[in-house]
């Protein structure tokens, strides 16, 4: 028995597709903006069904990598079958990244009690690439549709996809509040921005819920672990646009354009 308070076995992880920037994610519209061929699903529906069912039988919820909305659609089909077979299941599965989920898909995620874990940092690093090459200038505004997820009642967190980008919850929260490219400074989908309070919930209580640890972590309550961070100021009242934390540095927005800001951050070692 090697499980303890710091090393908990209650989830499995599988991949349903690849990455959008690698042109291997599976998209509903069958091709990329550049004309590149659609990525393939890794499993057929029956195989994924068998995997999820076996995981539940052994006491595991499953986090499922779904970058493209074609992969998200597959998860919705499969979990619906699972719930029709076992409607009283206690297991909560999660779609990871879920970057192009449609309004209809978000509604069904809520209905099936499937959690979502958005790659909040993505637009900061790849927003310009997605606008020009992978999904186009319209669809990029719908990437990481966190405001829509709130509207549909989806429980969700956010992440950095380490080691793709570094673990830094406050930076991920900043990205979710601003949706700004770190290269061009363009904002992609302002109507999908979160408030600071919503972003903080994503990296605290919602994150604990996704891990089935909400009875121990995620909020300051009697009986829960004293697992919290003391910050220099009230995050929900801070200027969410003016600066952010990255690699241990607080980067305050300088005078000039965002390219200069990125260059300054690189000079500081971030």
What is the role of each PLM region?
Residues 1-5, 85-86, 241:
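Short, conserved catalytic or adaptor-binding loops enriched in Gly and charged residues
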Residues 1-69, 73, 77, 108-115, ...:
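Metal-coordinating catalytic core of metallo-dependent amide/deamination hydrolases
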Residues 17, 22-24, 167, 239, ...:
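Short helix/loop capping segments that flank catalytic or ligand/cofactor-binding pockets
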Residues 44, 238-239:
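Residues that cap or delimit alpha-helices
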Residues 53-63, 70-93, 97-98, 103-107, ...:
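His/Asp/Glu-enriched, well-ordered alpha-helical/loop segment
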């Amino acid at each position: 028995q090697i499980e303890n308070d710091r090393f908990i076995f209650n989830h499995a992880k599988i991949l349903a597709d690849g990455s959008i920037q690698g042109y291997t994610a599976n998209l509903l519209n069958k091709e990329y903006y550049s004309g590149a061929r659609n990525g393939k699903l890794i499993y057929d529906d029956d195989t994924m069904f068998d995997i999820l069912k076996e995981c539940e039988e052994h006491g595991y919820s499953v986090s499922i990598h779904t970058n493209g909305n074609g992969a998200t659609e597959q998860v919705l089909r499969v979990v619906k079958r699972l719930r029709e077979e076992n409607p009283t299941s206690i297991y909560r599965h999660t779609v990871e990244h879920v970057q192009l989920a449609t309004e209809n898909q978000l509604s069904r995620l809520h209905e099936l009690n499937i959690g979502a874990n958005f790659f909040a940092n993505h637009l900061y690093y790849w927003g310009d690439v997605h606008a020009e090459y992978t999904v186009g200038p319209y669809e990029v505004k719908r990437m990481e549709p966190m405001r829509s997820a709130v509207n549909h009642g989806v429980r969700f967190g956010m992440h950095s996809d380490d080691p793709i980008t570094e673990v830094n919850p406050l930076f991920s929260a900043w990205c979710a509040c601003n949706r700004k490219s770190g290269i061009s400074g363009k904002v992609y989908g302002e109507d999908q921005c979160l408030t600071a309070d919503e972003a903080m919930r994503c990296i605290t209580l919602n994150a604990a819920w996704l891990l089935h640890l909400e009875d121990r972590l995620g909020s300051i309550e009697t009986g829960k672990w004293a697992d919290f961070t003391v910050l220099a100021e009230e995050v929900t009242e801070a200027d969410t646009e003016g600066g952010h934390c990255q690699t241990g540095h607080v980067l305050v927005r300088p005078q000039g354009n965002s390219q200069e800001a990125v260059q300054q951050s690189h000079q500081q070692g971030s």
